[in-house]
């Protein structure tokens, strides 16, 4: 029920905020093993799904470099430690959070989420630029999925690029 309400609240709102909320949602923490992800023993399940299915997408740029590396998944998993379901809500346990610096997409920082570190890792993911289209990669990824779902299975990248620009220009608001 709670996760369903979360999706309803953000369905046509801020996609970046939805991503932040889903990341620490009790149902998601249980479903993808985030609740067992602790400093020194991070679980990579959600980190992998976040990049692959929700924010970046698998694949390669025209120059042959991948959208992300295995190392990025490992470091992202470390940034997502410390959260655990607490009945119908969620609790942050500082003792379970990996406080050390992480290197994700080539940047080294104290990554975490929800104000628990110097750099919000979800904001950082959404700042990544698609090397081929020079637009935020997450916007290109989401807009490609929307185009394929509602228009045609073969995306027109000129239209997708314009959609991605609109999405990022409007603070990740899907209804824009």
Model-predicted regions and their roles:
Residues 1-176:
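Active-site substrate-binding loop specific to GH73 endo-beta-N-acetylglucosaminidase modules
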């Amino acid at each position: 029920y709670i996760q369903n309400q979360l999706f309803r609240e953000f369905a046509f709102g801020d996609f970046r905020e939805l991503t932040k909320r889903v990341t620490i949602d009790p149902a998601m923490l249980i479903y993808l093993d985030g609740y067992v992800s602790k400093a020194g023993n991070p679980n990579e399940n959600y980190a992998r799904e976040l990049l692959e299915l929700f924010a970046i997408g698998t694949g390669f740029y025209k120059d042959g470099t991948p959208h992300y590396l295995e190392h990025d998944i490992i470091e992202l998993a470390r940034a997502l430690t410390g959260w655990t379901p607490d009945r119908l809500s969620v609790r942050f346990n500082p003792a379970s959070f990996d406080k050390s610096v992480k290197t994700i997409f080539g940047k080294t920082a104290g990554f975490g989420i929800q104000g628990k570190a110097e750099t919000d890792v979800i904001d950082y993911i959404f700042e990544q630029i698609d090397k081929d289209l020079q637009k935020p990669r997450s916007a290109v990824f989401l807009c490609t999925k929307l185009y394929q779902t509602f228009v045609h299975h073969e995306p027109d990248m000129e239209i997708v690029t314009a959609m991605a620009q609109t999405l990022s220009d409007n603070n990740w608001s899907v209804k824009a």
